[in-house]
Protein backbone atom coordinates (compact mmCIF):
# COMPACT_ATOMS: atom_id res chain seq x y z
CA UNK A 1 0.00 0.00 0.00
CA UNK A 2 1.22 3.49 -0.85
CA UNK A 3 0.67 6.61 1.23
CA UNK A 4 -2.63 7.75 2.71
CA UNK A 5 -3.18 10.93 4.71
CA UNK A 6 -6.54 11.72 6.32
CA UNK A 7 -7.75 15.25 6.99
CA UNK A 8 -9.56 15.57 10.33
CA UNK A 9 -10.99 18.99 11.32
CA UNK A 10 -10.17 19.72 14.96
CA UNK A 11 -13.22 20.50 17.07
CA UNK A 12 -15.83 19.02 14.76
CA UNK A 13 -18.19 18.20 16.26
CA UNK A 14 -16.05 18.72 19.40
CA UNK A 15 -12.44 18.27 20.51
CA UNK A 16 -13.15 15.11 22.50
CA UNK A 17 -14.50 13.45 19.36
CA UNK A 18 -11.44 14.64 17.45
CA UNK A 19 -9.21 13.01 20.07
CA UNK A 20 -11.12 9.73 19.77
CA UNK A 21 -10.92 9.79 15.96
CA UNK A 22 -7.16 10.39 16.01
CA UNK A 23 -6.67 7.47 18.40
CA UNK A 24 -8.97 5.19 16.40
CA UNK A 25 -7.01 5.89 13.20
CA UNK A 26 -3.87 4.62 14.93
CA UNK A 27 -5.12 1.06 14.35
CA UNK A 28 -4.79 1.51 10.57
CA UNK A 29 -1.73 1.40 8.33
CA UNK A 30 -1.91 5.02 7.19
CA UNK A 31 0.87 7.51 6.57
CA UNK A 32 -0.54 10.35 8.59
CA UNK A 33 -3.28 12.75 9.58
CA UNK A 34 -3.71 16.44 8.84
CA UNK A 35 -5.28 18.07 11.87
CA UNK A 36 -7.30 21.02 10.57
CA UNK A 37 -7.29 24.29 12.52
CA UNK A 38 -10.64 26.12 12.19
CA UNK A 39 -10.61 29.55 10.57
CA UNK A 40 -13.34 32.10 9.88
CA UNK A 41 -12.50 32.52 6.18
CA UNK A 42 -11.38 29.12 4.82
CA UNK A 43 -11.12 30.23 1.19
CA UNK A 44 -9.61 26.96 -0.10
CA UNK A 45 -12.31 24.75 1.38
CA UNK A 46 -15.67 23.65 0.02
CA UNK A 47 -19.00 23.68 1.88
CA UNK A 48 -18.48 20.41 3.78
CA UNK A 49 -15.23 21.52 5.42
CA UNK A 50 -16.44 25.12 5.79
CA UNK A 51 -19.27 23.80 7.95
CA UNK A 52 -16.76 21.93 10.12
CA UNK A 53 -14.78 25.16 10.57
CA UNK A 54 -17.95 27.03 11.59
CA UNK A 55 -19.00 24.41 14.14
CA UNK A 56 -15.52 24.28 15.69
CA UNK A 57 -15.32 28.07 15.96
CA UNK A 58 -18.76 28.21 17.59
CA UNK A 59 -17.45 25.64 20.08
CA UNK A 60 -14.63 28.01 20.96
CA UNK A 61 -11.89 25.82 19.48
CA UNK A 62 -8.55 27.62 19.20
CA UNK A 63 -5.02 26.70 18.21
CA UNK A 64 -4.08 26.55 21.89
CA UNK A 65 -6.89 24.12 22.71
CA UNK A 66 -5.93 21.92 19.76
CA UNK A 67 -2.35 21.70 21.03
CA UNK A 68 -3.62 20.78 24.49
CA UNK A 69 -5.66 17.95 22.93
CA UNK A 70 -2.67 16.71 20.92
CA UNK A 71 -0.56 16.54 24.09
CA UNK A 72 -2.99 13.94 25.43
CA UNK A 73 -2.51 11.43 22.62
CA UNK A 74 0.25 9.23 21.28
CA UNK A 75 0.03 7.87 17.73
CA UNK A 76 2.32 5.96 15.39
CA UNK A 77 1.38 7.79 12.19
CA UNK A 78 2.75 11.19 11.14
CA UNK A 79 0.94 14.30 12.37
CA UNK A 80 0.59 17.42 10.24
CA UNK A 81 -1.09 20.69 11.14
CA UNK A 82 -3.23 22.24 8.42
CA UNK A 83 -3.89 25.89 9.17
CA UNK A 84 -4.45 29.12 7.35
CA UNK A 85 -1.67 31.62 7.90
CA UNK A 86 -3.56 33.94 10.26
CA UNK A 87 -3.85 31.54 13.25
CA UNK A 88 -0.13 30.77 12.93
CA UNK A 89 1.28 34.30 12.78
CA UNK A 90 -1.24 35.58 15.36
CA UNK A 91 -0.73 32.84 17.93
CA UNK A 92 -1.19 34.61 21.31
CA UNK A 93 2.20 33.58 22.69
CA UNK A 94 4.02 34.23 19.43
CA UNK A 95 4.72 32.26 16.28
CA UNK A 96 8.06 30.92 17.55
CA UNK A 97 6.44 29.56 20.71
CA UNK A 98 3.87 27.79 18.54
CA UNK A 99 6.56 26.21 16.37
CA UNK A 100 8.48 25.05 19.45
CA UNK A 101 5.32 23.39 20.74
CA UNK A 102 4.71 21.69 17.39
CA UNK A 103 8.24 20.28 17.49
CA UNK A 104 7.69 18.93 20.99
CA UNK A 105 4.49 17.27 19.81
CA UNK A 106 6.33 15.61 16.93
CA UNK A 107 4.35 17.39 14.20
CA UNK A 108 6.10 16.71 10.89
CA UNK A 109 5.01 19.76 8.92
CA UNK A 110 2.67 22.68 8.38
CA UNK A 111 0.15 22.75 5.54
CA UNK A 112 -0.89 26.35 4.83
CA UNK A 113 -3.55 26.61 2.08
CA UNK A 114 -3.30 30.38 1.65
CA UNK A 115 0.49 30.45 1.36
CA UNK A 116 1.49 30.56 -2.34
CA UNK A 117 4.31 28.29 -3.48
CA UNK A 118 6.51 31.28 -4.31
CA UNK A 119 6.22 32.57 -0.75
CA UNK A 120 7.16 29.31 1.00
CA UNK A 121 10.90 30.06 0.80
CA UNK A 122 10.47 33.71 1.84
CA UNK A 123 8.22 33.37 4.86
CA UNK A 124 9.96 33.52 8.23
CA UNK A 125 8.74 30.21 9.60
CA UNK A 126 11.52 27.87 10.70
CA UNK A 127 9.46 24.72 10.32
CA UNK A 128 8.87 22.30 7.42
CA UNK A 129 6.08 23.65 5.20
CA UNK A 130 4.32 21.41 2.68
CA UNK A 131 4.27 23.19 -0.71
CA UNK A 132 1.20 23.09 -2.94
CA UNK A 133 1.39 22.29 -6.65
CA UNK A 134 -1.49 22.76 -9.09
CA UNK A 135 -2.06 21.95 -12.78
CA UNK A 136 -1.05 25.53 -13.64
CA UNK A 137 2.20 25.57 -11.62
CA UNK A 138 5.08 26.77 -13.79
CA UNK A 139 8.09 24.56 -14.53
CA UNK A 140 10.55 26.93 -12.84
CA UNK A 141 8.48 26.81 -9.66
CA UNK A 142 8.48 23.01 -9.77
CA UNK A 143 12.26 23.00 -9.93
CA UNK A 144 12.43 25.36 -6.96
CA UNK A 145 10.53 22.83 -4.84
CA UNK A 146 13.63 20.66 -4.66
CA UNK A 147 15.31 23.37 -2.55
CA UNK A 148 12.50 23.42 0.02
CA UNK A 149 12.72 21.44 3.27
CA UNK A 150 9.41 19.61 3.30
CA UNK A 151 8.06 16.13 4.10
CA UNK A 152 6.09 15.93 0.84
CA UNK A 153 4.45 17.96 -1.93
CA UNK A 154 0.67 18.43 -1.97
CA UNK A 155 -0.77 18.22 -5.50
CA UNK A 156 -4.15 19.95 -5.89
CA UNK A 157 -5.92 17.71 -8.40
CA UNK A 158 -8.60 20.24 -9.28
CA UNK A 159 -9.13 23.98 -9.59
CA UNK A 160 -11.13 25.78 -6.92
CA UNK A 161 -12.00 24.57 -3.44
CA UNK A 162 -11.92 21.20 -1.70
CA UNK A 163 -14.76 18.74 -2.17
CA UNK A 164 -15.66 15.36 -3.61
CA UNK A 165 -15.72 14.68 -7.34
CA UNK A 166 -16.09 11.69 -9.62
CA UNK A 167 -13.28 12.04 -12.14
CA UNK A 168 -9.52 12.33 -11.70
CA UNK A 169 -8.23 15.03 -14.05
CA UNK A 170 -4.63 16.04 -14.72
CA UNK A 171 -3.18 12.52 -14.53
CA UNK A 172 -0.57 13.33 -17.17
CA UNK A 173 0.46 16.48 -15.35
CA UNK A 174 0.78 14.54 -12.10
CA UNK A 175 3.18 12.16 -13.85
CA UNK A 176 5.17 15.14 -15.17
CA UNK A 177 5.43 16.70 -11.72
CA UNK A 178 6.50 13.38 -10.21
CA UNK A 179 9.46 13.25 -12.59
CA UNK A 180 10.57 16.78 -11.76
CA UNK A 181 10.54 16.70 -7.97
CA UNK A 182 12.59 14.68 -5.49
CA UNK A 183 10.05 14.86 -2.64
CA UNK A 184 7.14 12.41 -2.25
CA UNK A 185 4.04 13.57 -4.15
CA UNK A 186 0.62 13.29 -2.50
CA UNK A 187 -2.56 14.08 -4.42
CA UNK A 188 -5.60 15.63 -2.77
CA UNK A 189 -8.80 17.64 -3.40
CA UNK A 190 -11.72 15.53 -4.58
CA UNK A 191 -10.63 11.97 -3.70
CA UNK A 192 -13.66 10.07 -2.42
CA UNK A 193 -13.60 6.49 -3.80
CA UNK A 194 -11.26 3.50 -3.65
CA UNK A 195 -10.99 3.47 -7.45
CA UNK A 196 -9.62 7.02 -7.35
CA UNK A 197 -7.19 6.13 -4.58
CA UNK A 198 -5.93 3.17 -6.60
CA UNK A 199 -5.47 5.32 -9.72
CA UNK A 200 -3.51 7.93 -7.77
CA UNK A 201 -1.30 5.25 -6.22
CA UNK A 202 -0.34 4.17 -9.74
CA UNK A 203 1.16 7.59 -10.58
CA UNK A 204 2.00 9.26 -7.24
CA UNK A 205 3.27 8.42 -3.77
CA UNK A 206 0.01 8.86 -1.90
CA UNK A 207 -3.41 10.44 -1.53
CA UNK A 208 -4.97 12.93 0.86
CA UNK A 209 -8.67 12.60 1.68
CA UNK A 210 -10.66 15.28 3.49
CA UNK A 211 -14.22 16.06 2.44
CA UNK A 212 -15.24 12.40 2.11
CA UNK A 213 -14.27 11.81 5.75
CA UNK A 214 -15.78 15.04 7.05
CA UNK A 215 -19.06 14.18 5.32
CA UNK A 216 -19.16 10.85 7.19
CA UNK A 217 -18.57 12.74 10.44
CA UNK A 218 -21.37 15.15 9.58
CA UNK A 219 -23.84 12.34 8.82
CA UNK A 220 -23.02 10.13 11.84
CA UNK A 221 -24.16 10.17 15.44
CA UNK A 222 -21.46 11.68 17.62
CA UNK A 223 -20.63 8.48 19.49
CA UNK A 224 -20.32 6.56 16.21
CA UNK A 225 -17.98 8.99 14.45
CA UNK A 226 -14.62 7.30 15.31
CA UNK A 227 -15.72 3.86 14.07
CA UNK A 228 -17.44 5.35 11.01
CA UNK A 229 -14.31 7.28 10.02
CA UNK A 230 -12.15 4.17 10.44
CA UNK A 231 -14.59 2.15 8.31
CA UNK A 232 -14.53 4.84 5.59
CA UNK A 233 -10.74 4.92 5.54
CA UNK A 234 -10.61 1.12 5.28
CA UNK A 235 -13.00 1.31 2.35
CA UNK A 236 -10.85 3.95 0.63
CA UNK A 237 -7.58 2.05 1.03
CA UNK A 238 -9.17 -1.30 0.19
CA UNK A 239 -8.60 -2.86 3.60
CA UNK A 240 -11.14 -5.29 5.03
From Swiss-Prot:
Entry EC number(s): 4.2.1.20
Coiled coil (UniProt feature): none
Pathway given in the UniProt record: Amino-acid biosynthesis; L-tryptophan biosynthesis; L-tryptophan from chorismate: step 5/5
GO terms of molecular function: tryptophan synthase activity
CDD domains per UniProt: Tryptophan_synthase_alpha
Catalytic activity: (1S,2R)-1-C-(indol-3-yl)glycerol 3-phosphate + L-serine = D-glyceraldehyde 3-phosphate + L-tryptophan + H2O
Positions annotated as active site in the UniProt record: 34 (proton acceptor), 45 (proton acceptor)
Keywords from the UniProt entry: Amino-acid biosynthesis, Aromatic amino acid biosynthesis, Lyase, Tryptophan biosynthesis
Any one of the GO CC terms: cytosol
PROSITE patterns for the chain: TRP_SYNTHASE_ALPHA
Function, in words: The alpha subunit is responsible for the aldol cleavage of indoleglycerol phosphate to indole and glyceraldehyde 3-phosphate.
Similarity field: Belongs to the TrpA family.
Subunit structure: Tetramer of two alpha and two beta chains.
Protein known as: Tryptophan synthase alpha chain
Species whose genome carries this gene: Thermotoga neapolitana (strain ATCC 49049 / DSM 4359 / NBRC 107923 / NS-E)
UniProt lineage: Bacteria, Thermotogati, Thermotogota, Thermotogae, Thermotogales
Amino acid sequence: MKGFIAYIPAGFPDLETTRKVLLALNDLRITGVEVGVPFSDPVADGPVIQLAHSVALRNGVTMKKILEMLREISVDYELYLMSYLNPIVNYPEGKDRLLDELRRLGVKGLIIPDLPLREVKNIEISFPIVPFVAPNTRDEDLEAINTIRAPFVYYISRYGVTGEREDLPFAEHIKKVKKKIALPLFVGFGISRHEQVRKVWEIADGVIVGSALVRIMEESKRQEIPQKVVARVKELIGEK
